[in-house]
Amino acid sequence: MSKTGGNDSKSTLYCSFCGKSQHEVRKLIAGPTVFICDECVELCMDIIREESKSSLVKSRDGVPTPKEIRRVLDDYVIGQDFAKKVLSVAVHNHYKRLAHATKHNDVELAKSNIMLIGPTGSGKTLLAQTLARILDVPFTMADATTLTEAGYVGEDVENIILKLLQASDYNVERAQRGIVYIDEIDKISRKSDNPSITRDVSGEGVQQALLKIMEGTVASVPPQGGRKHPQQEFLQVDTTNILFICGGAFAGLERIISQRGKGTSIGFGASVQAPDDRRTGEVFRSVEPEDLLKFGLIPEFVGRLPVLATLEDLDEEALKKILQEPKNALVKQYQRLFEMENVELTFQDEALGLVARKAIERKTGARGLRSILETILLDTMYDLPGLDSVEQVVIGPEVVDGKSKPLFIHGDRNKDAPASVSA
């Protein structure tokens, strides 16, 4: 709405929501019949963020059911039904364990930490990131490759707990009820079965350091992070109720699994073993704790991760769905970028299938899809801002193959029908 000032010949505009004038705010956005100021926009965004944070529908006791957690995971992650089921049950039980602990019952419910094993690009990290969006307990992600044992250059394992504290705004009580996801856990495996003069500061030493915080201990965490020193004050965090989820690609584990049970023999009478033609994800389904020990994880560490969830290789159909269906699907993202240039981006179905096959050939899974699309669309995104009258860009299979350029459809104002040209 607008109001005319006493001495001003100009109209003063007011926010339709809070009533502030255009002079009291930084920005006033006009609609057909209403105005909204930047402060009200920020307030609306805060409300939306709060609602999305608690978007899980909860049952009467305040604990989201596994199916409700699974439903939210389905919005962002395609396939991987078994891993979703394992995570949904684990998070549901985590909520129940926290509720149970407050009632001081006689039976103590122990936590079941989880190990996610799957090929590169199968969705391990995305599952964890999606959980972070929807949980109302503190959640943090850590990278195992940055960790070293105490006394060496690198991050202490206590830094993981510090990140959880930061995620809970330094509320120790909330942090003690949180969930931690440690990515690239396979990178801290022992480098060799044989003892060495050189100390393995980022392998077995880190596993030993992680044992206590995963099992449950009172960790002393420097409030500002970094290394500890005697004059520093520490925050005491009990990790007993913190749920740990570890994930890794475990490259080479499939060979260990395939060899197990085959038996070995030598000489002229030895039987010839047929090669294992199964895909990596299929082989991972047969994983046993002993395979992880051979890979380089120490027995105590494997014992603290009793739940093993494996992820499968993504086939062409799954990769095509990943390109199109999730809320943050890559095709939707690029279409939105082109919309900002007032251009419609269209992918033919055969083109998406070819993109999926290229990702499979590269053995990069879903992670390789963005790289392929960037290569395909690079020249178009470079040229498009300088072109006039382009209404639509069509990507066909020959474009993905690099045999031709995308089809540009121009809107010709002087003719009834648009003219199509290849650019």
From Swiss-Prot:
<comment type="function">
    <text>ATP-dependent specificity component of the Clp protease. It directs the protease to specific substrates. Can perform chaperone functions in the absence of ClpP.</text>
</comment>
<keyword id="KW-0862">Zinc</keyword>
<dbReference type="GO" id="GO:0140662">
    <property type="term" value="F:ATP-dependent protein folding chaperone"/>
</dbReference>
<dbReference type="InterPro" id="IPR038366">
    <property type="entry name" value="Znf_CppX_C4_sf"/>
</dbReference>
<keyword id="KW-0547">Nucleotide-binding</keyword>
<comment type="similarity">
    <text>Belongs to the ClpX chaperone family.</text>
</comment>
<dbReference type="GO" id="GO:0051301">
    <property type="term" value="P:cell division"/>
</dbReference>
<dbReference type="Pfam" id="PF06689">
    <property type="entry name" value="zf-C4_ClpX"/>
</dbReference>
<keyword id="KW-0067">ATP-binding</keyword>
<dbReference type="GO" id="GO:0005524">
    <property type="term" value="F:ATP binding"/>
</dbReference>
<dbReference type="GO" id="GO:0051082">
    <property type="term" value="F:unfolded protein binding"/>
</dbReference>
<dbReference type="InterPro" id="IPR046425">
    <property type="entry name" value="ClpX_bact"/>
</dbReference>
<dbReference type="InterPro" id="IPR010603">
    <property type="entry name" value="Znf_CppX_C4"/>
</dbReference>
<feature type="domain" description="ClpX-type ZB">
    <location>
        <begin position="3"/>
        <end position="56"/>
    </location>
</feature>
<dbReference type="GO" id="GO:0046983">
    <property type="term" value="F:protein dimerization activity"/>
</dbReference>
<dbReference type="GO" id="GO:0016887">
    <property type="term" value="F:ATP hydrolysis activity"/>
</dbReference>
<dbReference type="GO" id="GO:0009376">
    <property type="term" value="C:HslUV protease complex"/>
</dbReference>
<feature type="binding site">
    <location>
        <position position="37"/>
    </location>
    <ligand>
        <name>Zn(2+)</name>
    </ligand>
</feature>
<dbReference type="InterPro" id="IPR027417">
    <property type="entry name" value="P-loop_NTPase"/>
</dbReference>
<keyword id="KW-0143">Chaperone</keyword>
<feature type="binding site">
    <location>
        <position position="15"/>
    </location>
    <ligand>
        <name>Zn(2+)</name>
    </ligand>
</feature>
<dbReference type="InterPro" id="IPR050052">
    <property type="entry name" value="ATP-dep_Clp_protease_ClpX"/>
</dbReference>
<feature type="binding site">
    <location>
        <position position="18"/>
    </location>
    <ligand>
        <name>Zn(2+)</name>
    </ligand>
</feature>
<feature type="binding site">
    <location>
        <begin position="119"/>
        <end position="126"/>
    </location>
    <ligand>
        <name>ATP</name>
    </ligand>
</feature>
<dbReference type="InterPro" id="IPR003959">
    <property type="entry name" value="ATPase_AAA_core"/>
</dbReference>
<dbReference type="GO" id="GO:0008270">
    <property type="term" value="F:zinc ion binding"/>
</dbReference>
<keyword id="KW-0479">Metal-binding</keyword>
<dbReference type="InterPro" id="IPR003593">
    <property type="entry name" value="AAA+_ATPase"/>
</dbReference>
<dbReference type="InterPro" id="IPR019489">
    <property type="entry name" value="Clp_ATPase_C"/>
</dbReference>
<dbReference type="Pfam" id="PF10431">
    <property type="entry name" value="ClpB_D2-small"/>
</dbReference>
<protein>
    <recommendedName>
        <fullName>ATP-dependent Clp protease ATP-binding subunit ClpX</fullName>
    </recommendedName>
</protein>
<dbReference type="GO" id="GO:0051603">
    <property type="term" value="P:proteolysis involved in protein catabolic process"/>
</dbReference>
<comment type="subunit">
    <text>Component of the ClpX-ClpP complex. Forms a hexameric ring that, in the presence of ATP, binds to fourteen ClpP subunits assembled into a disk-like structure with a central cavity, resembling the structure of eukaryotic proteasomes.</text>
</comment>
<feature type="binding site">
    <location>
        <position position="40"/>
    </location>
    <ligand>
        <name>Zn(2+)</name>
    </ligand>
</feature>
<dbReference type="Pfam" id="PF07724">
    <property type="entry name" value="AAA_2"/>
</dbReference>
<dbReference type="InterPro" id="IPR004487">
    <property type="entry name" value="Clp_protease_ATP-bd_su_ClpX"/>
</dbReference>
